[in-house]
Amino acid sequence: MDLLYGGWEAMQTKAFFLQALTPVHPGTGQVSGSVIDLPVAREAATGFPLIPASSLKGVLRDGRTDEAANKVFGSPEQMGELTLTDARLLLLPVRSYAGTFALITCPLVLQRWRRDAEALGLSLELPQPSITGEEVLAGSAIQYNHQVILEDIDLRVKGSSEALAKAISGLLFGKEEQGLMERLALVSNDVFSYFCQTGLEVIARVRLESASKTVASGALWYEEAVPAEAVFSCFAIAKDAAHFAELHRRPYLQIGGEASVGRGLLRVLGGV
């Protein structure tokens, strides 16, 4: 889709998505003053986890320094021709009494995604249902006695999430994906914010003394990670649509810290 960008030049835009296959630690590069020593990056206003565009662009470039890579991603002397936004959280997995886990989103996330897509010239159909308080629109697998029980929160089923699940599934997979169709839950903005603060993984890490195999002094720390199955959304902007091929050059990416212990494996989806 064309839009006017910068110096009135016609630009192309694409929406694409990242699905976490293992927990992801998009760190801030700073030690926190809270109990969690190494938190994930978050939006300042909402507190929702995100993957910074700089991290994503660096992984896509993957250390390449050839002229073609410099043209697309930039160099110290020139700006790259491919622009990426931060990858924002679209779906968050939360433990569910029925169906093992739910994939939750909220009206605020959907409204912001649609607003950004329209601003970038993308005309994509995405339902905008409303939900408040302790209500939920839910897939069949996560319902129990007309309720959805997420961790310690009981929500009353207002209706089905099928229409929304079909739309999101189409964006991500190009078809109806059964797991998403059965597990999608639209919760209120407040409930989504609550789980963004409390529903992430907190992992204790230690460093052992090689001789005694005991924890070294001061070598216990806690780090935060976005759980596996989470889905992030991102927009790409370029004058030449051929640059979008870089988004799918590899079907899987490793993003964030702790790669040596399996963190940060994501699958690239979409491209609409």
Predicted regions: what they are:
Residues 1-272:
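Basic, Gly/Ser/Thr-rich N-terminal segments that form RNA-phosphate-binding interfaces in CRISPR RAMP
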